[in-house]
Design a protein with these regions (language model features):
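Surface-exposed substrate-engagement region within the catalytic domains
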Residues: 162-274
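Distinct, well-ordered alpha-helical segments
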Residues: 151-156
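A residue-level signal for conserved active-site and pocket-lining positions in enzyme catalytic cores
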Residues: 139, 186, 282
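A motif-centric signal for short, conserved binding hotspots located
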Residues: 97
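Long, acidic (Asp/Glu-rich), low-complexity accessory segments flanking structured domains
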Residues: 3, 19-93, 102-131, 136, ...
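Active-site groove signature of glycoside hydrolases
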Residues: 100, 133-147
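Aromatic-acidic/polar surface patches that form glycan- and anion
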Residues: 72-79, 87, 114, 118, ...
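Classical eukaryotic N-terminal signal peptides for Sec-dependent ER targeting/secretion
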Residues: 1-15
Length: 300
């Protein structure tokens, strides 16, 4: 979910001041949408059978938008599974937002603190890759409401303390699966020397501003998603494609929109005849385990 930090802040403050209520979590677990804490299906080592010679850009992979946004109410929350549960369910793209203050990197969604810091994220990823060395994890790393300090230096310090330098893929070039196994690929969305692949080098569709849950607004969002997915199937194979199915506004909270978009995405993908198509990364809010599994299935 992109946009100015000030706009996000205004939305969150407005939601509190207006006391607006939206459909709450009801422990919904469907093929496309899940706001429970436990995935229905696990796919912890699905990359193991992908040939080493395949480029990571050839892989169709499920991801989550604002991966760690588990707290803060319905306008801030984008997922209900823990990071470890997401990885075990098959999620391989993480969208991590860090706030840099006084040398610390805490996890935030806008003004909402997520009761975690970047070290927690790194430790979970390290533990997962040690248990499943056939896998790779892509991580968009973005500043959220930071001060003016050097975020690059703080990120490097956290990596050295909570992980290890060799965990990272150290190149702007997209690796093959053989090169990427057991690695964390940082998609760098902040200034400074290279830590990995620059986020803005990807072909990205992130039309996150959905003004309401009215049918025409939801349809507009879905057209953006489906159009970019189709573009990924015929696009440059040497470039990674990233499609966000997520969106939000004061009148369209992430969970409410995901309940409408995710079933469409699931129906669209399950109805696709050609399982060899490359869709790239599909980043979602509250994905259902069967939707995750369906995305994985396009690699076989």
């Amino acid at each position: 979910m992109e946009g100015t930090r000030g706009h996000i802040l205004q939305l969150m403050v407005m939601g509190v001041l207006l006391g607006m209520t939206f459909p709450g979590y009801g422990a919904n677990q469907t093929p496309g949408y899940d706001d429970t804490t436990t995935p229905e299906i696990l796919n912890p080592y699905w990359m193991a059978t992908i040939p080493d010679i395949y480029s990571v850009s050839d892989v169709t992979m499920p991801g989550t938008h604002n991966t760690m946004a588990l707290y803060g109410g319905s306008l801030a929350e984008c997922n209900s599974w823990s990071l470890t549960s997401q990885l075990r369910a098959g999620i391989r793209f993480l969208d991590i937002r860090v706030r840099h203050a006084k040398g610390n990197l805490t996890i935030h969604h806008g003004i909402s603190y997520q009761y975690a810091h970047f070290g927690d994220v790194l430790m979970d990823v390290v533990a997962f890759l040690r248990e499943y060395p056939s896998e790779t994890v892509l991580m968009r790393l973005k500043e959220e409401l930071s001060d003016t300090r050097d975020i690059y230096g703080a990120v490097v310090r956290y990596i050295n303390v909570y992980a290890h330098w060799d965990l990272l893929w150290h190149s702007r070039e997209i690796p093959t699966m053989g090169e990427a196994r057991g690695k964390l690929i940082v998609l760098q969305d902040f200034t400074g020397p290279d830590l990995g692949i620059r986020y803005n080098s990807l072909d990205i569709a992130d039309d996150w501003k959905v003004s309401s849950l009215q049918p025409e607004e939801v349809a507009k969002k879905w057209r953006s998603v489906s159009t970019h997915l189709e573009a990924a199937t015929v696009g440059n194979k040497n470039r990674m494609f990233l499609t966000y199915s997520s969106g939000a506004s004061i009148l369209a909270h992430p969970n409410a929109l995901a309940r409408l978009i995710n079933p469409r995405l699931y129906e669209y993908l399950t109805g696709y005849d050609d399982q060899s198509k490359r869709f790239g990364i599909v980043a979602m809010d509250f994905p259902g385990a069967k939707l995750v599994q369906t995305i994985i299935g396009f690699n076989y």
